[in-house]
Structures are given as C-alpha cells and as structure tokens.
C-alpha cells in the first residue's frame, strides 16, 4: 500500500508539473486583445468611434512564422490607426529585420506611428532601424506631433523620444527631459491630444502637462502577475509597480499601459499573457 501511495504521489506530481509547464507556455504565447473606451467632450464628432490599436515592447518576439499570428490578430481588430510605443527591438538580441518585417505588414492594415523605448537607445543600429521604418511607411515621432484629420476635424498626436537617448537609463533625470519634450510641442489650439511615450512611471508628469490620453508600455505587465496584487516587478518602478498594466485616470488625463507582447531580461511571463491594446474614442 505504501509503495502504491508513493507511486500515486509521483504520478500526480508529474501531472501537476506538466500542467503548470503547459499553462506557463500558453501564457507566454497566447496573444490577447484588450479593449478600452475613452469618453471625452474634447473628442471631435468625426473621431467618435475611432479605433487605435497599440503594440508595445515587441522585443524581437515572433508569434508564428514571420509574426503571422500577431499580424492576423492586429488585422482582426480593424483599427483606424496603429501605435507602437517603443522597444520594438531588444538590445540584447537585436534583429532589426524582424522589426522591419512586422512594421511593413502593419502599415498595410492602418497608418502606423512609432516612438522609441530604452532598448532603441542602446543599439548602434538605431539609425538603420529608423530609416527602415520610415521607408516602410511608418511615421517616426521623435519629440514631434502630427495632426490626425478626419472629415474636416482633427486630433493631435504627439510622440516623445525615450529619455534614455539623453540621460542615463537608471540614474538620469528622465522626468525633466520628458517634460521639456512635451511642453515644447504643446499649443492651446491642439484640442484632444494623444501622447505616445514609452514610460508609464512618468504618469504624474503627463497629468501635470494636461495630456488627454497616453499610450505607454515598458512595464511588461509587472512580468509575474499575482492574484489581487498585480505585477511583481517593472523597470524603473521596482517591486509591486503602481503603473504595471491597464487604465489609469487622474484629473483629465487617461493613461493606457500595455502589458506588451515580448520579453527581455526576464524571458518569462506568469499569469501575464502578451496583449494587443485597442482603444475606442467616443465623444461624450
């Protein structure tokens, strides 16, 4: 009987380990789509029902051959605009061809706008990446803004370069660099303003500068998501990050933080599947 019990314990243990392994693998490869709706009386009538898809932190990840799964899911969301919020490549295993192939396919779905992350700031190939993105039809925003026009009305899209291009990644004054970039672009006539910025930890700055909607990433959802707690760790926020994933609202500013689709120094997600974010604008 004791031998039988030991055998059963061993079998159950193996099955549990296998199930956990399958669940973890699935959780790292099963792409999700998460939708949000933004209501504002500043949104022009022409942009009510305007859909924005966000891809964050690709880090050279591939979902299917030539990222066909990611592209197909992005296509199914039927966006009016696609935004890429940094870390399209990974500085530890840089392959700009994966990034450019993805971008070239994404622009066939909708207009694509891109800002850098901290990983782009680390690679010597960034100039080559930027040129390739531009040639593919992607609009690269480096402390720049554009007017998005529809039916005679417009919203303002701003994109700031990751502060790592001008400061030390861990110890530089990212807030002052980003503040200068944002305020240099702002104008009272901008109307409803969307900001692309890689760094969610700067949310107080975005609120202070009065931006209406921010798309961000960088936190990877906190990497390991604990029930009833949230993310465990995120770059530039440390343990139990406040801005790990989801929607954050303060005053008149809303920030959407994507969990991202790829990984970097920690090549594992737990209870934190990769996601595409889709946001619908609606006039209130």
Q: Which sequence ranges carry the predicted segments?
A:
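Conserved beta-sheet core of the metallophosphoesterase superfamily
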Residues: 104, 199-277
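Beta-strand-turn-beta hairpins that frame and shape the catalytic cleft
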Residues: 39-53, 138, 145-159, 249-254, ...
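Binuclear metal-dependent hydrolase catalytic cores centered on His/Asp/Glu-rich metal-binding motifs
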Residues: 131, 135-138, 150-193, 203-204, ...
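Short, Asp-centered acidic motifs that coordinate Mg2+ and/or phosphate
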Residues: 80-81, 113, 138-139, 155, ...
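N-terminal membrane-anchoring alpha-helices
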Residues: 1-46
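Catalytic metal-binding/acid-base residues of hydrolase active sites
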Residues: 59, 89, 119-120, 145-146, ...
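Extended recognition/assembly regions associated with phosphoester-bond processing machinery
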Residues: 18, 22, 34-39, 181-191, ...
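Membrane-embedded segments
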Residues: 46, 50-144
């Amino acid at each position: 009987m004791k031998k039988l019990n030991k055998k059963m314990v061993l079998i159950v243990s193996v099955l549990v380990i296998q199930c956990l392994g399958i669940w973890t693998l699935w959780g790292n490869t099963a792409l999700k789509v998460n939708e949000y709706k933004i209501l504002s009386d500043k949104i022009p009538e022409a942009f009510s029902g305007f859909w924005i898809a966000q891809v964050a932190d690709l880090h050279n990840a591939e979902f299917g051959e030539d990222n066909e799964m990611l592209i197909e899911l992005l296509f199914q969301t039927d966006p009016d605009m696609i935004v890429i919020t940094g870390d399209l490549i990974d500085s530890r295993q840089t392959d700009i061809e994966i990034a450019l192939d993805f971008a070239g396919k994404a622009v066939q779905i909708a207009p694509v706008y891109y800002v850098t992350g901290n990983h782009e700031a680390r690679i010597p190939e960034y100039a080559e990446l930027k040129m390739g993105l531009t040639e593919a039809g992607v609009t690269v925003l480096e402390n720049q803004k554009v007017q998005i026009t529809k039916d005679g009305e417009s919203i303002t899209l701003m994109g700031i370069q990751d502060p790592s291009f001008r400061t030390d990644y861990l110890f530089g004054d990212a807030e002052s660099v980003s503040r200068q970039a944002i305020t240099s672009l702002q104008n009272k006539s901008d109307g409803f303003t969307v900001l692309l910025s890689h760094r969610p930890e700067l949310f107080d700055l975005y609120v202070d500068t009065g931006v209406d909607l921010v798309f961000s990433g960088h936190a990877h959802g906190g990497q390991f998501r604990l029930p009833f707690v949230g993310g465990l760790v995120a770059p530039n926020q440390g343990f139990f990050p406040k801005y790990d994933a989801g929607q954050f609202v303060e005053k008149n500013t809303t920030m959407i933080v994507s969990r991202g689709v790829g990984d970097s120094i920690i090549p594992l997600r737990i209870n934190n599947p990769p996601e595409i974010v889709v946001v619908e604008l609606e006039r209130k």
